[in-house]
Amino acid sequence: MVQGTLYIVSAPSGAGKSSLIQALLKTQPLYDTQVSISHTTRAKRPGENHGEHYFFVSEKEFCQMIDDDAFLEHAKVFENYYGTSRLAIEQVLATGVDVFLDIDWQGAQQIRAKMPTARSIFILPPSKTELDRRLRGRGQDSEEVIAKRMEQAVAEMAHYAEYDYLIVNDDFNLALSDLKTIIRAERLRLGRQKQRHDALISKLLAD
């Protein structure tokens, strides 16, 4: 079985990261590509299902998983814990399915340290002006919040050079095409192709 690839995707808020990942998943069958499902201690919201949106666990269970080094990365956000299970990711990758993980640069650093075979993608907006427009377009934040988000975005973008691939999301369809191209290129790497076509290669090279 050909091993799947873990893709780490990071971007500042407003760059279109989540929209690109969701659009990608709609074009890929589940046996090819999936999105990572995190563990969390926060309460389940209406319409959310365990194992579909999150793995909902108690704080005691989560802390035990930390002690057992069960997470590729974890963080505490607004009094709730969130983490990416190493076992859950490895089980999916072992079936040959590629996994996408939407995470910030700090989480990406943790994951690369524990899983160096992961591929990382950073998504940039085409300009600060466009990023500001997108943040304002949500129509739900005050000027103070928008200014804070812009400040955080600049800090986040400063880490772009730590990633393997860089996509500028100016034209959404072009950015989506770039994302698909990265996946296609990774699947054509020698190691994966050799595994996939081992029988064919053996026959072609036989005397």
Curated annotation (Swiss-Prot):
Question: Which amino acid positions bind ATP, per UniProt?
Answer: 11-18
| Subcellular locations according to the entry | Cytoplasm
Instruction: Name the keywords, alphabetized.
Output: ATP-binding, Cytoplasm, Kinase, Nucleotide-binding, Transferase
Entry's Gene Ontology cellular component terms: cytosol
Predominantly, its location class is cytoplasm
Q: Does the keyword Transcription apply?
A: no
Q: Which residues form the Guanylate kinase-like domain?
A: 4-184
Q: Does the keyword Cytoplasm apply?
A: yes
Task: Report the EC number(s), separated by commas if there are several.
Answer: 2.7.4.8
What's its catalytic activity?
A: GMP + ATP = GDP + ADP
> Known InterPro entries for this protein?
GK/Ca_channel_bsu, Guanylate_kin-like_dom, Guanylate_kinase, Guanylate_kinase_CS, P-loop_NTPase
GO MF entry, a single one: ATP binding
One Pfam family from the record:
Guanylate_kin
The task this protein performs is described as: Essential for recycling GMP and indirectly, cGMP.
Q: Per its UniProt record, what NCBIfam families does this chain match?
A: guanyl_kin
The family classification in the record reads: Belongs to the guanylate kinase family.
HAMAP family for this protein: Guanylate_kinase (MF_00328)
Name of this protein: Guanylate kinase
Which source organism?
Yersinia pestis
